[in-house]
Amino acid sequence: GFRLQIFSASTRQAAEDARNRAKQQLSRDDIFIDFEPPYFKVRIGNFKTRKDAEKLRDTAKKQGYETPFVVETQIQTSPQ
């Protein structure tokens, strides 16, 4: 699946602060902090298609996020 990465930091606290800001600015609850040493990465969504993630990328840019980008990664899916 795909997620939108909006932030990367070397400390968990900085990533948590960014996640909290994103929750308010983008009105989403599906915001995750993924630790890929040495960085904590703030990523949004559980998108099955790149196109859906790109829609959120465009919205994030309008909200002031300068360099959001789509990443292919494992996502959480709900059972059908």
Q: Locations of the language-model features?
A:
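Extracytoplasmic
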Residues: T11-K41, N46-Q80
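Acidic/histidine-rich, surface-exposed loop or edge segments in extracytoplasmic proteins
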Residues: G1-I6
